[in-house]
């Protein structure tokens, strides 16, 4: 039997074995000691040091397990970030690289019994993109480092500046509409005053004509001097004066007809003004619709319904969740309301949710995209709703008909 000296073959073999990986079931995580065989592990479990560590564990087992689980997850993700940051790789390959470090946190000390459970946890929490294939589980690291966050901030700044520019343009259009309305109203007022002046002038001309007719026809004109002597008109004079009076009545009728025509013209001009304003408003709505109508509609903070039949086995089909984050405009990180699990779902497999009447909604598409509004009513036959915008540039504006797909309940 070989001796156990320092340079003997047996001692060298033991040191080589100690450097390499040993069996996982003979490792004590609390004492961080690896045993070489079952007998050694049994002796270690009966030792005084191990018993003390087990007493510490018994005081708060949940905290100890959570601590090891957090350390295991963090170390695993650090390895993914360093070695496979932008690649899709098999989970077993990453795990084999991870356990090459003999001082790693062992999985039997965490809350996950198998690698599959741990990979599913990474997918639910949104830390990795998880995919199950016939060849096993594949994972892709989701980069959330400072560089990515910096790019996201720049992107958000660009979006905000674009929105501010759109608001400025809309305000300018609104001012132009108001100026056009004021000019139209001012022009109408001048026309009315000129019309009144013409009426007065016509009346003066008619009075002058009447006086000339009286002088030519020889009608006597009486002047009251001093005592105010009354002049008695003859029958002939009465007849002629009555003719003149009837002539004045006819002139009054003509004047009334002209006034009616002018009032009709002013009414028509008012209608024309209103129609012009309506046309301007419609043009503005169409322009906003063209600018803000997108093929993506996800926003953070809205409640959506999962309609993916592939997730029916997991119990997520037709379940509601809150959009916590939007990735590349089309994919949302959804935190389920019931299970609190986090999923990544494409917008094609999601559906908008309507609140009760009076609830708050987000306009997710169309002319007023991004505005918050209050639901006033629902038309089930036309599949549209009536909302009133709250806050922002369009505060108080009522949209009488907006499609269900363009609004979504706010969380």
UniProtKB/Swiss-Prot annotation:
This is KIN17-like protein. Keywords: Coiled coil, Metal-binding, Nucleus, Stress response, Zinc, Zinc-finger. It comes from Arabidopsis thaliana (Mouse-ear cress). Residues 182-211, 232-286 are annotated as: Disordered. Residues 301-352 are annotated as: C-terminal subdomain A. The keyword Nucleus applies. The gene is KIN17. It holds the Pfam family WH_KIN17. Plants silencing KIN17 show aberrant growth and reduced fertility. Residues 51-160 are annotated as: Winged helix-turn-helix (wHTH).
